[in-house]
Amino acid sequence: MVADPRVAGVTFTGSFEVGMQMVRQFAHGAWPRPCIAEMGGKNAVVVSRHADLERAATGIVRSAFGLQGQKCSACSRVYVEKPVAEALRALLAEKTGMISVGDPTLRQHWMGPVINETAYRRYRKSAEHLRRHGSILAGGEALEAGPLGKGWFVAPTVAGAPLDDRLWREEQFLPLVLVGEVDSVSQAIDLANASEYGLTAGFYGGRDEIPYFLDRIEAGVTYVNRPQGATTGAWPGYQPFGGWKASGTTGKAIGSFYYLPQYLREQSQTIVD
């Protein structure tokens, strides 16, 4: 369909593989046309020794487990400086353990099931991998008892793993977040950038550290010291939303002045009476 010249423009949200297939087909058209693509992420959060850990833990939990971790902006990896790593892990485990999982139409439940059996099996496989090669700090189980056994319900999971483990690189799209210790903010940023993706990235730390983080991080959407966690455009009428690298292109913010011009055609008019 995208190869048809009658298609004036395309906005895509989905996997990198499908997105790149679409972009290539679209580029082979008879003339250039606007194309916006959002194609996944492996979103990182950096926590410095100067961070407000309560705020950081709250933001990470909201970002990692909101909508069952099945949103493009979800945090899935955390790099924390060693002096505060133990305290942050304890807070994350505590807050994660308080999450109520169940029927998402009921107000008492904050998290519902994962999308389908494929995601459910991927979760179980990843949790088993972490039990063997890392550590489970909270969760790590499929919820099979009682009425939850009739759906694809899993526990929100906080885990640790060696920094070279494959789960730090692979997009999971699950309620699963890894936490790793680093020696410095600089090392954390290097690890955050060592990914094919670059959609969202968060930072919790001191005011003086913020410019350094924002200058070096490779992500299209950034947030700093935000207790609500990752944003899909906190102010969508004013902020562009989109990624770098394999995460796609910036500019996806419906209704904003960053978005609309990409689907407008300029015409210069000179009229002489």
Language-model regions, residue ranges each:
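ALDH superfamily catalytic-core signature
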Residues: 5, 9, 17-163, 186, ...
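Conserved C-terminal structural/oligomerization subdomain of aldehyde/semialdehyde dehydrogenase
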Residues: 6-7, 11, 46, 58, ...
